[in-house]
Design a protein with these regions (language model features):
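A generic N-terminal leader/anchor concept
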Residues: 11-17
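Structural beta-sheet core signal
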Residues: 19-22, 86, 109, 158
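PLP-dependent amino-acid enzyme catalytic core
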Residues: 13, 47, 59-79, 158, ...
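A nucleotide-sugar donor-handling region in carbohydrate enzymes
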Residues: 25-32, 131-192
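Short coil/turn segments at beta-strand junctions that form active-site/ligand-binding loops
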Residues: 16, 82, 188-190
Length: 192
């Protein structure tokens, strides 16, 4: 996933340690139980917080966020982190931001300043930005947006997209394997 390279760097540094709480789509059968990929990469998962959303009405989302705050707070009190790293803009990430803010644990927000037009995600992402002490954005435009939200420029760092490192460090699949996996045969010209 997007955080795997960062987690590898932290794991290699003897002065640092990290605790990993996995929730959301990582635990979803529909999304392929991707927490198993985390385990396959030899990362210890300190806790799994299973949160099921039962509908998409405002009251369902409020229940989900409330449950997430309650469960994440319980784990944070137990783990006592010095810093919380958050990537994303989903309900559970927003909930983790609320918990960290209330427990006065600094938040390091990754990929802030981005825009998802026509989606509520922007509101959650920008709220997480406002709760955060450190900001690691993917480009200068997003740095400008985080700055416009009133954040200290000294705490905003342009580091590029985490997906780029993931792609650069991925093993490429052969053309033949793609054809086999997708049950197709590439022609001279192909349209994706």
């Amino acid at each position: 996933g997007l955080l795997s390279n960062l987690m590898k760097l932290v794991k290699r540094d003897k002065k640092l340690s990290f605790n990993l709480i996995v929730t959301g789509s990582h635990l979803s059968k529909t999304h392929g139980h991707t927490y198993q990929e985390i385990l396959k990469d030899k990362f210890n998962i300190n806790d799994k917080i299973d949160l099921k959303i039962n509908g998409d009405k405002p009251r369902d989302i409020c229940r989900y966020i409330s449950l997430a705050v309650k469960k994440i707070s319980k784990k944070i009190v137990k783990l006592k982190p010095d810093l919380i790293i958050l990537l994303g803009d989903r309900y559970e990430i927003f909930s983790a931001g609320i918990v960290a803010l209330i427990h006065q644990i600094p938040i390091c927000h990754l990929h802030g300043g981005e825009i998802t037009e026509g989606s509520i995600d922007d509101v959650f992402r920008h709220s997480i930005t406002k709760m955060s002490a450190l900001h690691f954005v993917s480009n200068l435009e997003y740095k400008k947006r985080v700055r416009q939200l009133g954040e200290n420029p000294k705490n905003i760092f342009v580091v590029g997209g985490f997906g780029v490192d993931l792609i650069k460090n991925s093993k490429l699949i052969s053309k033949k394997k793609i054809e086999t996996n997708l049950n197709l045969e590439f022609k001279k010209k192909n349209l994706l």
